[in-house]
Swiss-Prot record:
Keywords: Cell projection, Cilium, Coiled coil, Flagellum, Repeat
Record protein name field: Flagellar attachment zone protein 1
Region annotation 37 X 14 AA tandem repeats of E-E-L-E-L-K-[VA]-A-E-N-E-K-L-A: where it falls in the sequence: 1012-1529
UniProt keyword Repeat, yes or no: yes
Gene expressing this chain: FAZ1
Coiled coil: 613-657, 684-864, 903-1607
Biological role: A component of FAZ filament that is required for correct FAZ assembly and attachment. Not essential for new flagellum growth.
């Protein structure tokens, strides 16, 4: 059966169509996972259609990725819908629960007011009744149980106990003011059901009295309020919705990460493989059978899909699950093999046992049959045959009877043992009470009864309850009668009706008297429990102990009350109760202090161990980081040297190639078709290397900081150890004070005893009473002082513990910070490794490029040397594998023409010589046209001067506005200090922007210098007009690029303004959060102030008590008044104690409120996570907007293409104008002036951007002022919260207004275009300039052709070529500088994007709060109007430079791509951080699993020990079986000997028969006639004998089966018998001494109220546990040591 249970496990249920990941052996060597669609499955095998890895074309893979992105977006939409519905449900559930709580609270408050209005006299009348009504008793019990949160009150308290509780002053007020919601009453349903019955309903309560009716209503309303309040935290629907929200967020996050990876792979355009980011699969029709145990997991893929894509995260999860399943399968297989081996061993033993039994059965059968046939062969022995058949039947039937009897005996023994099973459980059944007696022999029972009556009573009740299998309260009316020889006990037993009195008597007689015998033996041991309490009370009140010997505690209290020690019974009882309460409080406080110290010490040790482990791990990691940094530095140095060696060679080769290509292009030759070399990367690589070195230095500084933090942690640990030693010393002081208190009490007892002996007369008795009263007062004062000292010590200890807890929390926070720093350093190292890999790849590429250049260079030298007409190169050729110095390459001539091209060039030069005359004439015409263009350009210059004057006026107006704004900034300087952190970030952005602007200015200066050089060259070389036109075109391009940069800066300024506004919003939201936190802190401070006030009140009360004590000492003569005042003061002390309890309850409430606040903070954190998810949605929308912008850029490019077509048409028309060549110089000068004007405009745009930034700063300051005003006006904040919905509507209206403003802006643009005075002239001039530029470009193209022909014909080609080469080199330098500037701009853009990402996060939170400030909205509208004016002016200026805007859009698209790449990098970093967190969580889980495994190993060790014990028992049983088999063999031999004796007897009898026959020969003749009859009878007898033998054989076969079944039944019964004997309750203490060993055990009890038992009834709990543990282990109770109780809540 064990093997069957192991094999038959629940298989995994799969549905057809599901996509699963499963394991299979690839090539029979190693495991590999694959995807498959389930076709069918049974209990052990699953048939799947396998998915193959997609290795098709890139287009197919891109299609798969795009379809997967669409699927994930759909899933994200489904998750979003589920999230919104879950949020709505959660809000509805919470509102429903809160409404229920508010309604129940209102009813409860009404009931409390109704109870408070009841007269106290009326309540005393109710409690003074001797026989109250059942409804009154039940209601008062319910109120008491509910106020004390003790359900035992309703079952165990009597009417006298209830009266005592309600007699206390202000008892009703205390009960109704109890914390109902603090603790949940466990048996609320019982009270509700009982109070809703007809005889205990509200009608019955109202008929009884008004007080009972109000209390009845209070109980029901309190239970309803408690239930509604518990629903707030225990409502499972809330947790379900929270789980649904968490699942939706996790699903959205997973979808988003997968979409990001898919988009990244789609943009990269590579082929996804197993080693990359993605893995693509395609569904095939190949079916495969796989075992069901090889299924790893179910993959979330649409069954209808034909292809799918998995990310590396999903693949990693599948691989982890595959490893887990393989480990589980191996474990299961080993378990199966062990079970199989056990089953095979058991089967082998059974087969051997059955074969042996079969051999024995065959031997017995053969002997039996042989004896039958031998006896049947003899003649004239019918009697003998009958005897043998009878004996055979008896021998056959004997085993059956013996085994049946054995089974019956075993069943009877088992039945008897099961009736004495110690694992009995009491069931609630109808009961009956019977009278019983029991006697115990012994001569010292009278001594036991006299010395330990309470212990004797509890021991007897426990023992008899265990004997009768009933609870202890079922043993009643116990009477002890002790004689000189025995103890006679009579008692009543309440037992179930199905048990008779005879059965109970039998149980009582059979049960061993273990506890009673121990009491008789330990009669001289010290007293304990209530017996000790009687002695302590007698000593405290100076009573004679011998007067109360043999009395129980209840009788003792009655006798003491009858003595009339203090005139009033109630006062005396209250004094005794006060003393007992004081003692109990002292012990409880000491115990609680001990417990807290132990817990704090354990916690401190645990924290210290964890910190040491973390410090050790940090040290190891620091060492690794140092080694890694050293290695990286070495690599950086090597790469730097290598880069320096190869940079010069590579740059020279590139320069030669570019120069050759330019010269070839100028001469209409095709460019080289060799592989393009990479861009100059060595400069960028050095910068990156410098950055990495700076990162290494930062890592070193972080390591030093971590070392300092570790040292600080060690110092904090030493401080904590010192504090712990101080707390332990305080604990020892408290214990010493407790001992001193006990010694003083004993001294007072001795003094009172001595004073009693000297008194004889009544007057002396009065004096003795006065002395006793004074002694009691002194004791009370001392006790009060000691209690105050204990409380102060407890407060100080608690303060130390709280301080230590705070330090531990600080240590945890520091450790978390160090872990974060460590994670950051690891991330930096990973980035360094990636960068190092990139450098290696670049190095390999550069080396391959150098090899290709060297090989080309060597081939060119070889080919040149073979040509006789060309001059050979003087340098020696080297193998292309060797390095060539830069000087050698620079000294060589530039090779840019092939031989064929050179020959063609010579042939064409002859042709061009013939056409030279014609071209000269055309040049003359071009000069004439140029003069005309010069005149027109002068007119345009005058018009441009007028426009510049207008711009100058506008600039002056802007300056005046700046002065006005500066005045506003001076007024807001006092607010600038509060926003330094936010403005610092913006200032950094501004500085970076200024850097970019300074770079642009430098470029402008360089452009001016180039333009001046071009003018000089144009003046010197009139013949090179065509080249000047080319340069002018290049200058125009540069100007356009400058304008693009300016527009880019303007866009950046606008984005900065938006970010500033978003920062302001986020600042507002942060300040609101800070205000809420300040409110919470103020509430906490108020609560702390209330606690301090309570402490001060307690101190005042203590001072009042001292004053009262002094007054009592002065009025010692007035005994009666002193007694009354003592009673009053005792009542006041009780009130104070109750007030202390109430304050403690209030403190508990405050702690619970703090926990609720913490839960609310957690909810806020969850809401923040949701906000982050919404922000991610907005980021996706921004990406969509970026895509739209890209589309717009494409449309602009189309427009540019159309413009180019128009330009071509204009060029055709300009070909007819021959005079354009003359106007070229004038146009160049005008273009220079235009470039200068553009630079001025760029400067003006920069100023405008700065003004916009100032505006943003002003807006921030205004926002901060508004936030301060909001913080100062809390009432306004509440109203603003109420008007949040209205503000949201206003925000929507504002958005509509913004849209309208945008429309107005568009209209203004149209109107600005219509303004003829300001804009038409400028636009016309710009259009004319553009047309002229296009015409110039057409002429430049024609002139280029002419210049090329002239260069071929003119002898001055060499000079021109050299000048052109110099210009090309300068242009290349400029291009390189521009590339460097572009790289710097990209870096600045990346930094701006990082800042923008941070600002976006802040902005998304601030946008929600932006609508709350109406004044700010109005001011923002005013500012928006001003900005719109500025925007209009900027648009007018932007309209002048359309081409620059187009290039700006292209740059913006590139920047957006870079921003997306940055976002992807940030997402990857976040993924790495999350993976690190997951790894940390997995490590913690592994640690927990290791602990669980250790616990399981311990359990397995215990099970192995049990198995060993069972094996020993089985060995003993086998020995018993062997002994039984031997006994059976002996019985068989005895029976065989008996058969032989019977054979001898029969032979003797035959002889006698022969003698009789000889004597009776005379009668033979008479018998001869009967011979024939006898012969026939003999034949018939033989036939019957044969039939009987056959029947016996069949019976033997049947008996063998029954014997085997009976033997198995006997074996099972014997096992059951052994088990029941082990758990039999009739065990006795061992009489002989044996070796003992002490072991530690743990037992867990389920339940919610164990903490209350531990605190309220520790002694009862200890005694009950010791009794149960002793009975379970079959040892006396005094052998149960070191019992400690630990509540499950304290473990966590």
């Amino acid at each position: 059966m064990a093997l069957l249970n192991v094999i038959s496990e629940n298989p995994l249920t799969l549905q057809p169509g599901q996509v699963i990941a499963f394991d299979h052996l690839a090539n029979g060597e190693h495991w590999q996972w694959a995807l498959g669609t389930v076709v069918s499955s049974d209990k052990h095998v699953v048939v799947v259609e396998q998915w193959a890895v997609n290795e098709g074309s890139c287009e197919t893979l891109k299609h798969n990725i795009s379809s997967e992105i669409q699927k994930e977006m759909k899933r994200m939409g489904v998750f979003q819908e589920q999230l919104s519905s879950a949020r709505d449900k959660l809000a509805a559930i919470r509102s429903e629960n809160e409404d229920r709580v508010s309604a129940a609270r209102a009813v409860f408050e009404d009931a409390k007011a109704r109870v408070a209005s009841v007269d106290e006299v009326h309540m005393r009348e109710v409690t003074s009744q001797a026989c109250p009504s059942p409804v009154a008793v039940e209601v008062l019990k319910s109120v008491l149980a509910l106020a004390q949160n003790d359900p035992t009150v309703t079952n165990c308290s009597t009417w006298d106990d209830i009266r005592m509780e309600y007699r206390r002053p202000n008892a009703i007020a205390d009960f109704i003011s109890a914390d109902i919601t603090g603790k949940t009453y466990p048996n609320a349903e019982e009270i509700c059901s009982s109070l809703n019955e007809q005889r205990l309903s509200s009608l019955a309560a109202s008929r009884d009295s008004e007080a009972i009716s109000s209390l009845h209503h209070w109980v029901l309303s309190a239970l309803a309020y408690q239930e509604a309040y518990c629903r707030l935290t225990t409502d499972t629907r809330v947790q379900e919705q929270n789980d649904a929200i968490a699942n939706c967020i996790a699903g959205m996050k997973g979808c988003r990460l997968k979409v990001m990876k898919l988009k990244e792979e789609l943009e990269r355009g590579g082929t996804p493989t197993f080693g990359g980011q993605l893995t693509s699969f395609t569904k095939t029709s190949v079916q495969l059978k796989a075992p069901l145990s090889s299924v790893i997991s179910i993959v979330g893929v649409d069954p209808s899909a034909q292809d799918c894509v998995l990310t590396d995260d999903e693949v990693g999860l599948i691989l982890d699950k595959a490893e887990q399943t393989r480990l589980q399968i191996n474990d299961h297989f080993s378990h199966l093999s062990n079970s199989y081996m056990e089953a095979m061993a058991e089967l082998h033993c059974l087969s051997m046992y059955t074969s042996e039994l079969e051999e024995r059965r065959l031997n017995l059968q053969e002997r039996f049959v042989f004896s039958l046939f031998t006896n049947a062969g003899k003649t004239n022995a019918p009697r003998r045959e009958r005897i043998e058949t009878d004996v055979g039947l008896r021998s056959v039937e004997a085993p059956r009877g013996d085994s049946a009897n054995n089974i019956k005996d075993l069943q009877e023994i088992i039945k008897e043992l099961s009736s004495h099973d110690e694992r009995w459980m009491y069931r609630n059944e109808p009961t009956v009470t019977t009278k019983h007696r029991k006697s115990y022999p012994g001569r010292e029972w009278s001594k036991v009864v006299e010395r330990k009556p309470e212990e004797l009573l509890s021991t007897f009740r426990t023992e008899q309850a265990a004997a009768c299998h009933v609870p202890e309260d079922a043993i009643r009316n116990i009477e002890f009668t002790a004689t000189s020889e025995k103890l006679q006990v009579s008692f009543d037993v309440q037992h179930p009706v199905k048990q008779t009195a005879a059965e109970i008597n039998k149980r009582l007689q059979e049960f061993p008297s273990r506890g009673m015998d121990r009491m008789l033996c330990d009669v001289d041991q010290p007293k304990k429990g209530l017996d000790r309490a009687i002695v302590e009370v007698c000593r405290a009140f100076d009573l004679r102990e011998h007067a109360f010997r043999g009395m129980t505690f209840d009788k003792f209290i009655e006798e003491v009350a009858m003595k009339g020690r203090v005139g009033d019974k109630d006062a005396y009882e209250s004094e005794i109760g006060d003393l007992l309460m004081l003692l109990d409080k002292i012990h409880n406080e000491n115990r609680s202090l001990q417990y807290t110290l132990e817990k704090s010490a354990e916690e401190f040790r645990r924290q210290t161990a964890s910190t040491m482990r973390e410090q050790e791990s940090l040290r190891q990691r620091n060492g690794e980081l140092h080694a890694e940094i050293g290695r990286l530095r070495d690599l950086v140095e090597k790469l730097r040297d290598l880069a320096d060696n190869q940079a010069s060679e590579l740059e020279l080769l590139k320069l030669q190639k570019t120069q050759a290509n330019q010269i070839r292009a100028q001469r209409n030759l095709s460019t080289f078709r060799g592989d393009d070399t990479a861009e100059p990367v060595y400069c960028v690589t050095l910068d990156e290397l410098r950055e990495q070195t700076e990162h290494c230095d930062q890592v070193e500084r972080e390591l030093e900081r971590q070392r300092e933090q570790c040292q600080n942690l060690l110092n904090a640990q030493d401080d904590l150890l010192a504090e712990l030693s101080g707390v332990s010393e305080e604990k020892e002081k408290l214990e010493a004070e407790c001992e001193r208190l006990e010694a003083e009490l004993r001294q007072m007892e001795e003094k009172s005893r001595l004073s009693e002996q000297g008194l004889s007369e009544m007057t002396q008795r009065l004096e003795e009473k006065q002395a006793e009263i004074e002694g009691l007062l002194e004791n009370l004062e001392q006790l009060d002082e000691q209690l105050e000292a204990l409380r102060a010590a407890e407060k100080s200890a608690q303060a130390h513990i709280e301080a230590r807890d705070r330090e531990i929390s600080d240590l945890q926070q520091r450790l978390e910070g160090e872990i974060d720093d460590h994670i950051k350093t690891t991330a930096l190292l990973e980035e360094l490794r990636k960068h190092y890999n990139n450098l290696e790849e670049l190095f390999d590429k550069q080396e391959a490029e150098l090899m290709a250049y060297r090989e080309k260079r060597q081939n060119a030298h070889k080919v040149r040397s073979l040509e006789p007409t060309l001059r050979p190169i003087g340098t020696q050729t080297k193998p292309f594998q060797e390095m060539v110095s830069a000087d050698e390459i620079s000294s060589e001539p530039l090779l840019s023409v092939t031989l064929d091209e050179y020959n063609d060039h010579m042939h064409r030069s002859n042709q061009f010589q013939q056409e030279n005359d014609l071209l000269r004439q055309q040049l003359q015409q071009a000069n004439d046209e140029r003069e005309n263009l010069h005149d027109r350009l002068e007119q345009l210059m005058a018009e441009n001067q007028s426009l510049s004057e207008q711009l100058h006026n506008m600039h002056e107006e802007l300056e005046r506005e700046e002065r006005d704004r500066s005045g506003v900034t001076l007024q807001n300087e006092r607010l600038a200090e509060e926003i330094q952190r936010k403005t610092a970030e913006n200032e950094q952005l501004v500085l970076e922007n200024n850097k970019s602007r300074s770079d642009i200015r430098n470029l402008n200066v360089q452009v001016q210098r180039l333009m001046e050089e071009l003018e000089l060259k144009a003046a010197e070389n009139e013949k090179l007009a065509e080249e000047l036109e080319l340069k002018a075109a290049e200058n125009e391009k540069l100007a356009e690029e400058l304008e693009l940069k300016v527009a880019e800066n303007e866009k950046l300024a606008e984005e900065l303004e938006l970010k500033v506004a978003e920062n302001e919003k986020l600042a507002e939201e942060l300040e609101l959060k800070a205000a809420e936190n300040e409110k919470l802190a103020e509430e906490l401070e108020l609560k702390a102030a209330e606690n301090e006030k309570l402490a001060e009140e307690l101190e005042l009360k203590a001072a009042e008590n001292e004053k009262l004590a002094e007054e009592l000492e002065l009025k010692a003569a007035e005994n009666e008044k002193l007694a009354e005042e003592l009673e009053l003061k005792a009542a006041e002390n009780e009130k104070l104690a109750e007030e202390l309890e109430l304050k403690a309850a209030e403190n508990e409430k405050l702690a619970e409120e703090l926990e609720l606040k913490a839960a609310e903070n957690e909810k806020l954190a969850e809401e923040l996570e949701l906000k982050v998810a919404e922000n991610e949605k907005l980021a996706e929308e921004l990406e969509l907007k970026a895509a739209e912008n890209e589309k717009l850029a494409e449309e602009l490019e189309l427009k540019v293409a159309e413009n180019e077509k128009l330009a071509e048409e204009l060029e055709l028309k300009a070909a007819e104008n021959e005079k354009l060549a003359e106007e070229l110089e004038l146009k160049a000068a005008e273009n220079e002036k235009l470039a200068e004007e553009l630079e001025l405009k760029a400067a003006e745009n920069e100023k405008l951007a700065e003004e916009l930034e100032l505006k943003a700063a002003e807006n921030e300051k205004l926002a901060e002022e508004l936030e301060l005003k909001v913080a100062e006006n809390e009432k306004l904040a509440e109203e603003l919260e109420l008007k949040a919905a209205e503000n949201e509507k206003l925000a929507e209206e504002l958005e509509l207004k913004v849209a309208e403003n945008e429309k107005l802006a568009e209209e203004l643009e149209l109107k600005a275009a219509e303004n003829e005075k300001l804009a038409e002239e400028l636009e016309l001039k710009v259009a004319e300039n553009e047309k002229l530029a296009e015409e110039l470009e057409l002429k430049a193209a024609e002139n280029e052709k002419l210049a090329e022909e002239l260069e071929l014909k003119v002898a001055e080609n060499e000079k021109l070529a050299e000048e052109l080469e110099l210009k090309a080199a300068e242009n290349e330098k400029l291009a390189e500088e521009l590339e460097l500037k572009a790289a710097e701009n990209e870096k600045l853009a990346e930094e701006l994007e990082l800042k923008a990402a941070e600002n976006e996060k802040l902005a998304e939170e601030l946008e929600l709060k932006a609508a709350e400030n109406e004044k700010l909205a109005e001011e923002l509208e005013l500012k928006a109007a001003e900005n719109e004016k500025l925007a209009e002016e900027l648009e007018l200026k932007v309209a002048e430079n359309e081409k620059l805007a187009e290039e700006l859009e292209l740059k913006a698209a590139e920047n957006e791509k870079l921003a997306e790449e940055l976002e992807l990098k940030v997402a990857e970093n976040e993924k790495l951080a999350e993976e690190l967190e997951l790894k940390a969580a997995e490590n913690e889980k592994l640690a927990e699993e290791l602990e669980l495994k250790a616990a399981e190993n311990e359990k397995l060790a215990e099970e192995l020990e049990l198995k060993a014990a069972e094996n020993e028992k089985l060995a003993e049983e086998l020995e018993l079986k062997v002994a039984e088999n031997k006994r059976l063999a002996e019985e068989v031999t005895q029976r065989l000997s008996e058969k032989e004796l019977l054979a001898e007897d029969t032979s003797a009898r035959l002889l006698e028969a022969d003698s009789a026959n000889s004597a009776l020969q005379c009668k033979v003749k008479h018998l001869e006639e009967k011979l024939t009859l006898l012969s026939s009878e003999k034949e018939t007898a033989l036939a019957t004998l044969e039939a009987e033998i056959v029947d016996l054989l069949t019976q033997l076969k049947g008996l063998n089966g029954t014997n085997s079944a009976l033997e198995s039944l006997c074996a099972s019964k014997e096992k059951e018998l052994v088990f029941l004997r082990e758990h039999c309750e009739l065990w006795t203490d061992p009489t002989t001494k044996k070796e003992k060993v002490i072991t530690r055990h743990v037992k867990v009890f389920d339940g919610n109220e164990w903490m209350k038992l531990i605190t309220d009834r520790p002694e009862a709990l200890m005694s009950a546990f010791v009794i149960d543990a002793g009975n379970a282990c079959h040892v006396p109770g005094d052998q149960i040591h070191e019992v400690s109780f630990l509540n499950n809540k304290e473990k966590h």
